[in-house]
Structures are given as C-alpha cells and as structure tokens.
C-alpha cells in the first residue's frame, strides 16, 4: 500500500450503499478509466490535484487508486459501454459505440473484462497491474466467471491511447526545465501542516 488515509466526500459516511457508475474510456495516464479509476471521484476536487502530484508515477498512482478502492469500497460497479471513448481520452478522445452494459461487485475483474473488450492488454493498465500485485485480480482473463459472454462485444479496431507514459516526467529523463517545474508544482500542490 502506498496510501493509508484518504480525504473523501463526507456524504459517503451516511450512505447505505455506494454504487459506482462509470463510462468505459481511454485515459492518458492509466491507459483506461473504468470501475477502479472512477472511484477517484470520491476524492474532493482540490485534493485530486495534490494526489496527482504526490503520485505522479503511473504505477504509484494506480496503487493509490487501489488503496482507495479497498478503503472505501463500492458495493456495486456498473460500466456503461453502450458508447465508450477511444483515442486520446479522457479529454481528446472520440465516442465509440460498443453496445454493452456491464456490472460486478468486483471492480478489478470488471476492469479486466472491459480491457478485453477494447483489446488493451492488462499489462498496459496500471490499475489492473496494481490489483494483480495484491492478488485482487487474476492474471488471466479466462479465470473470470461471467454470466453472459463478453467476447461478442470485442471491438477489434478500437483506438487505444497513444501514450500512457508519465505525464510529468518520462523515466526521470525530462529536460531540466521540466524537472524544475515538477519540483515547483509538487511544492505548490502538496499539503503541509502549519501552526495558526
């Protein structure tokens, strides 16, 4: 685990159940955003930026997202893949009809099925890799039991993300100005205790 304590929206404390509804989309940092990544929505907006800078490496960010799912689990996950998003999502993607609706109590297995539908290898999706590190998801999609076949919904020419590398720096080889900017952004976005 990389994170043990989370700031989250307070109304969850009074909820009888949490139902996580998401769209199946490509994502620049995570390869795909689906059930696991969508739970990041429970983090307040101002804190999201702080977490993005604190966990700027894609695998660290994915591990934090898995920590969040374990700390504040939803009881049901629903993926709207009637129309998904392909290309450079989530901001520069394009709508793509897929034609299915998926649901599960297990977000990690659900994400693996969704990755299979869009032809994205699980190894390219940090949240799936992070879940597999903790044995929350099987290594092979064939180990997942489903009520109806998902294979008819495979989109063979789905356009996946072109670049899922770390957006702040690439393997530590960023230009000097990029490293300096990264340090400034980290300092500005990180919370520090203070005396009032």
Language model region names:
Residues 1-196:
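Extended, low-polarity segments enriched in aliphatic/aromatic residues
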């Amino acid at each position: 685990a990389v994170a043990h304590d989370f700031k989250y929206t307070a109304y969850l404390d009074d909820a009888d159940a949490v139902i996580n509804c998401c769209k199946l989309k490509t994502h620049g940092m995570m390869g795909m955003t689906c059930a696991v990544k969508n739970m990041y929505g429970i983090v307040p907006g101002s804190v999201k930026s702080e977490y993005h800078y604190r966990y700027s490496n894609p695998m660290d960010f994915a591990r934090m997202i898995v920590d969040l799912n374990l700390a504040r689990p939803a009881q049901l996950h629903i993926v709207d893949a009637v129309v998904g998003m392909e290309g450079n999502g989530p901001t520069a993607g394009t709508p793509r009809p897929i034609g299915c609706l998926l649901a599960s109590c297990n977000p990690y297995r659900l994400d693996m099925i969704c990755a299979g539908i869009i032809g994205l290898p699980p190894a390219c999706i940090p949240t799936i890799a992070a879940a597999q590190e903790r044995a929350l998801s099987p290594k092979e999609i064939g180990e997942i039991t489903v009520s109806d076949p998902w294979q008819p919904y495979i989109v063979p020419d789905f356009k996946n993300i072109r670049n899922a590398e770390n957006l702040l720096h690439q393997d530590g080889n960023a230009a000097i100005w990029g490293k300096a900017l990264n340090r400034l952004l980290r300092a500005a976005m990180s919370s520090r205790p203070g005396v009032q």
